[in-house]
Amino acid sequence: MLQRILVALLALGLSPLAMAAPSQVRITHEDGRYVLRVDGQPFRIKGAGMAGAGPAALAARGGNSFRTWDTGTDVADVRAMLDEAQRHGLKIAMGIAVGNERHGFDYDDDAAVAAQLSRIREEVNLYKDHPAVLMWVVGNELNLHYSNPKVWNAVGAITDMIHREDPNHPVMTTLAGFDKRLIDLLKARAPSLDLIGIQLYGDIGALPEKLSTSGWTGPYVVTEWGPTGHWESPLTSWKAPVEDDATRKAQLLQQRYEQVIAADTTQGLGSYVFLWGNKQERTPTWYGLFLPGGESTPAVDAMEYVWTGAWPSNRATSVAPLHLDGRVATESVTLQAGKPYAAKIAAQDADGDALEYRWTMLHETTATSIGGDREDVPPAVKIALHGDGKGGLRFDAPKRPGAYRLFVEVLDGQGHAAYANLPFRVEDR
């Protein structure tokens, strides 16, 4: 009989895990502090934005939750994701795609707004009863490059609908920065939101002040944070952003978590670091905690430490800033076309692992996208790169003038890697 029931469930696209009771998630106010509770137990979010590195690795490193940005179009894939999260003891902040004005959505179009609400109702009802669901995230950075405040009325209507359809899970929206004017709009137009998601990068240290001056006294989750953003980093003289090396990023993540995120147990419910995987955004390494090849970086080690209080038994290599022609990126390195040059990266591995150095050169990106919109990886430069296997490199500068970027990955053979890159410009002799 049990076997026949399992077969019937699978035929309906439902797994046994999905048939378990939905999680009961509440935000309570206790002794002057907000507390997120899952099935009655306190739940401090130790999470990441998920982008391909996998729930198993997140759980192994001490994480307990991940967030998504939408529910996608393949129901079977979403249910498989929920099931996998449940197997690893993880909860998911389920992202719901909501039209952004910067992408052309018109909140004066009542028919489009109604159709969006109907579509979201269907999505919520598909997944609301899965035990891995933690909460709903209505849209992402809807305040980025927008002008029509009706978007917040739509968020309010979506929130009200979700509360009716799914009383078991809180609802929030995420904000790309915030101030009193924005918080006042949310209070007036979407008052039923249970909490807000805050997304800050290099300026996350200002979060306590922003909370105070904006008038937001309710609970929040830091739904995106991480390295210093490309828009707030130093620039070369030709406006190429300077990216921190992997070791510096790990140091900043640990510092920002300990000083800002972990420090607020009054309003803060935890965070989702960006990004558990990799993506191209100005460079292929700027935001991902993993390299495209799947290797974990020092940032992953840092997150394991702040989540668990212990470092992993084998850690990623440590690197110093990359030098080209004896200079670092902030010195706006300019080379002469066709001339020979040398680059150097200093690396140390605390475990004594043998190191492999991988060098690549790309054209500098011309992308100007915002808000994480899709970018293509710039084309590689067809040029001979002569590494010495010890962190040194020799090459002849490209013959064509323009903007380029030199990359190096330092792999330890244990599934970990550090990296650095340096933008440079080539001029005619």
Residue ranges of model-derived segments:
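Bacterial N-terminal signal peptides
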Residues: V7-P16
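Active-site mouth of glycoside hydrolases
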Residues: T28-E30, R37-L193, A206, W216, ...
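Substrate-binding clefts and catalytic carboxylate motifs of secreted carbohydrate-active enzymes
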Residues: E30, V38, I45, S212-R374, ...
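Aromatic- and acid-rich polysaccharide-binding/catalytic face
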Residues: G177-W231, L235-T236
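Short, surface-exposed loop/turn segments at beta-strand-coil junctions that are enriched for proline
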Residues: D396-P401, Q414
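C-terminal edge beta-strand
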Residues: A420-E427
